[in-house]
Amino acid sequence: MPPIHRLVNYVDVPSRSPNTVVEIRSRDADRTREEILRAAMAEFAGHGFGGARMGAIAERSGVDKKLIYYYFAGKDELFLAVLEQTYADIRAAERELHLEASGPLEAIRSLVAFTWQHYVKHPEFLHLLNSENLHRARHLKRSTRIREMNSPLVQTLGDILERGRRDAVFRGGIDPVQLYI
């Protein structure tokens, strides 16, 4: 019988290799980080950045408040991580639309319909954006990750608008960023 290793969360796991404990701890760390992010999303969406409390996030996530500071340097970094995850989710869903394969008008209609439905299904997204807008996008401005996520969408929109201009469906000079906003 393989040896048993006692882990931080007191689960006995048979060990097949020396890396087993590290892998399990890594999965536990990932799960803990995800729980903190989920709790933080709910807290920030419900109370805004200014009203959200780290203690409430700790309580919602079921972890000690000190553990939140192990994963995130502070409230600003946690809020930014929530924003980045939220943007990653919507950008991944938008990629599934395959807008580049549709005609210009249909692509824009699909994006508008999708965006509206996403906002309806995920009202926390709008609450987070409203909170960030109140702070003049101070967190978004610091995020290279969000800029990198937005760039392909802006490029795709620009291509769609150009195809639409060539097909005389759209007028020229439409800024893809302003259109999306």
Residue ranges and their predicted role:
Residues 72, 131-137:
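Short helix-capping/turn signature of helix-turn-helix
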Residues 1-31, 42:
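N-terminal intrinsically disordered/low-complexity leader segments
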Residues 46-50, 100-101, 122, 167:
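Short coil/turn segments at alpha/beta junctions that flank glycine-rich nucleotide-binding fingerprints
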Residues 35, 43-77, 81:
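Helix-turn-helix
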Residues 140, 150-179:
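Hydrophobic alpha-helical bundle segments that form small-molecule/ligand-binding pockets
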Residues 32-40, 57, 82-86, 90, ...:
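Generic hydrophobic, amphipathic alpha-helix propensity
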Residues 75, 82, 86, 90, ...:
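Hydrophobic/aromatic residues within well-ordered alpha-helical segments
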Residues 95-127, 147-150, 154, 176-180:
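Hydrophobic alpha-helical connector segments
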